[in-house]
Amino acid sequence: MAEEKELVLLDFWVSPFGQRCRIAMAEKGLEFEYREEDLGNKSDLLLRSNPVHRKIPVLLHAGRPVSESLVILQYLDDAFPGTPHLLPPANSGDADAAYARATARFWADYVDRKLYDCGSRLWRLKGEPQAAAGREMAEILRTLEAELGDREFFGGGGGGRLGFVDVALVPFTAWFYSYERCGGFSVEEVAPRLAAWARRCGRIDSVVKHLPSPEKVYDFVGVLKKKYGVE
């Protein structure tokens, strides 16, 4: 496909938001060019492409920028309809499909609003505030586990494969070890089915290729702590 060569992702290696875009394109079989950004010295291309938020990830498709990772995932479904869907296909007048799409969007938004926010506080805080954030994270993971239920994947696109919520959430599994170390809990103990889901995802080629090791992420968290004077 000629369009595949026109995809460029402006990204940063440890960003879960960029990783979800990379995984989505890999799942769809789309070729893309990865361009690592120096977030301390952002490129002119990034600043021109996302002048409102001035942040990664940005997907350039034939030179046209698309910003915000969940928007990018939905754009990929729309722009490449012949590839595996992340969201259930939209069928005019099909209330069940509309509900499934809305539900997937809700849980992806939950990941961004709750899990990401709490995870950021976990490494920034100390003492009892950090312990409280650890308890909050454990409850967030239990909530996600309840939504997963007995399914193999959260799904969305069908066919027993990664769907919209899976792709939105799976990059954060590389941060689970850091959450455990900072929060004083075990993901396996508080949400064993979610931990099993993470292991299943971790055997999928697109995830293996585009997620860093938990240890490398934890080393990065240590750098952040020093940078912000947490330690």
From Swiss-Prot:
Its EC number is 2.5.1.18. PROSITE patterns: GST_CTER, GST_NTER. Residues 5-84 form the GST N-terminal domain. Gene3D superfamilies: 1.20.1050.10, Glutaredoxin. One of its GO terms (molecular function) is glutathione transferase activity. It catalyses: RX + glutathione = an S-substituted glutathione + a halide anion + H(+). Coiled coil: none annotated. Keywords: Transferase. Belongs to the GST superfamily. Tau family. This is Probable glutathione S-transferase GSTU1. The lineage of its organism: Eukaryota, Viridiplantae, Streptophyta, Embryophyta, Tracheophyta.
